[in-house]
């Protein structure tokens, strides 16, 4: 049997939190964001480009929202038209049927068979 040493032998970091910090740095990297060092002219160009990009993204988002609003209103109008045309078809379309032929949860078929676990 080996003789137990009197002092604690530490080959790694001095305490537990340092080792956790080292693991976090290794896994996730350093989260500190370095500021860009630019001359004033380059900084102004950078700001103009960022502003233009934000405006572009804002306009795209508004366009998407308008498209979705239009789709929703068209669906609503179509449902109302169906309701006026045929009440039975409207009820069938609006019912949440459990006996669907292809449920949403069904996996898509693939060309290869699934892997069997060993």
Swiss-Prot record:
Give the protein's recorded name: Large ribosomal subunit protein mL40
Q: Which gene encodes it?
A: mrpl28
Q: What does this protein do?
A: Involved in mitochondrial genome encoded proteins translation. Component of the mitochondrial ribosome (mitoribosome), a dedicated translation machinery responsible for the synthesis of mitochondrial genome-encoded proteins, including at least some of the essential transmembrane subunits of the mitochondrial respiratory chain. The mitoribosomes are attached to the mitochondrial inner membrane and translation products are cotranslationally integrated into the membrane.
| GO annotations of cellular component type | mitochondrial large ribosomal subunit
Top-level taxon in the UniProt lineage: Eukaryota
**Subcellular location field:** Mitochondrion
In which broad location class does this protein mainly occur, judging by the first location in its UniProt entry?
mitochondrion
- Which GO terms fall under molecular function for this chain's record? structural constituent of ribosome
A biological process (GO) of this protein is: mitochondrial translation
Tell me the organism's taxonomic lineage: Eukaryota, Fungi, Dikarya, Ascomycota, Taphrinomycotina
The family assignment reads: Belongs to the mitochondrion-specific ribosomal protein mL40 family.
Subunit structure and binding partners = Component of the mitochondrial large ribosomal subunit (mt-LSU). Mature yeast 74S mitochondrial ribosomes consist of a small (37S) and a large (54S) subunit. The 37S small subunit contains a 15S ribosomal RNA (15S mt-rRNA) and at least 32 different proteins. The 54S large subunit contains a 21S rRNA (21S mt-rRNA) and at least 45 different proteins.
Quote any Pfam family the record assigns. Answer: MRP-L28
Fetch the PANTHER family from UniProt.
54S RIBOSOMAL PROTEIN L28, MITOCHONDRIAL, LARGE RIBOSOMAL SUBUNIT PROTEIN ML40
Q: Record keywords: Ribosomal protein included?
A: yes
Annotated organelle transit peptide span: 1-35
The ranges of region (Disordered) come to 1-21
**Gene3D superfamilies xref list:** 6.10.250.3440
Q: Which UniProt keywords apply?
A: Mitochondrion, Ribonucleoprotein, Ribosomal protein, Transit peptide
């Amino acid at each position: 049997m080996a003789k137990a040493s009197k002092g604690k032998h530490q080959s790694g970091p001095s305490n537990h939190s340092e080792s956790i910090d080292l693991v976090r740095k290794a896994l996730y990297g350093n989260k500190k964001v370095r500021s860009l060092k630019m001359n004033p002219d380059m900084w102004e160009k950078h700001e103009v480009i960022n502003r233009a990009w934000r405006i572009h993204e804002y306009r795209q988002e508004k366009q998407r929202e308008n498209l979705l609003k239009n789709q929703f209103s068209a669906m609503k109008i179509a449902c109302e038209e169906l309701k006026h045309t045929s009440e039975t078809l409207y009820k069938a379309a609006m019912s949440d049927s459990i006996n669907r032929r292809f449920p949403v949860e069904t996996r898509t078929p693939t060309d290869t068979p699934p892997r069997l676990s060993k």
